[in-house]
Curated annotation (Swiss-Prot):
GO biological process, one term: enzyme-directed rRNA pseudouridine synthesis
Active site positions, chain numbering: D102
Top class in the EC scheme: isomerase
InterPro entries to which the protein is assigned, alphabetical: PsdUridine_s_RsuA/RluB/E/F_cat, PsdUridine_synth_cat_dom_sf, PsdUridine_synth_RsuA/RluA, PsdUridine_synth_RsuA/RluB/E/F, PsdUridine_synth_RsuA/RluB_CS, RsuA_PseudoU_synthase, S4_RNA-bd, S4_RNA-bd_sf
Molecular-function GO terms, alphabetical: RNA binding; rRNA pseudouridine synthase activity
Keyword set includes Acetylation: no
NCBIfam families (UniProt xref): pseudouridine synthase
Keyword 4Fe-4S: no
Span of domain S4 RNA-binding: 2-69
EC number, UniProt record: 5.4.99.-
Identification of the protein by name: Uncharacterized RNA pseudouridine synthase RP544
Record keywords, A-Z: Isomerase, RNA-binding
Domain of life: Bacteria
Amino acid sequence: MCRLAKIISNAGVCSRRNAEKLIVGGKVKIDGITILSPATNVDMSNQIEVSGRLINNTQKPRLWIYYKPVGLITTHKDPLSRKTVFEQLIGLPRVISIGRLDLNSEGLLLLTNSGDLAHQFEMPASKLKRVYNVRAYGNPNILLKNNYKNLKIDGIFYNPHSIKLLRQNKSNSWFEVVLFEGKNREIRRIFEYFGLQVNKLIRIQYGALKIGNLKPGNYQEISNKILEKQLVMCF
């Protein structure tokens, strides 16, 4: 037996919190009967509908590494009709992203069919390392020679773990940035604060998972063995 909200989340429909809202809002049925309590227990024999759509309540959590190209947004529906990551994914079941990459960023984006798994990866207590390669225009010394930790920008605190100069040419510099808790546009805001303009941002690692030789637009599934190892290491 398992709680209804968890089953819906594990099916990749939404997060567990949003699943609870759907249940309370009367959008969920078990064997044709509307259920209003998120704490309701169900098993594999029950037929579950969410907003009129049957879900698979027996699937195992799965995880994919996807190389998100520039120009796609990480959402299922966009009010501005921009191209989304999920419109480009062919051959995958319904998935959700673990975290986000903004429109002009690229690189490693984790996808899963399990809302519970996504929650485990995203919560700050997991302390999963995110590594980025960043190209920026401007004087790198202004950033590197000042204290970039515990910055308060527009009322929001940012605390990158490390920023390291990789190489420098006449107009641009490449940096490695390591975060343990990513906030919206955190890297771009920090660089802008020190007068640098980010013109390329690539996430290359999330936890122990790396982008490797994956090309933009391609994805690969993580084996159960590697997924289990990742979960043991981090949680």
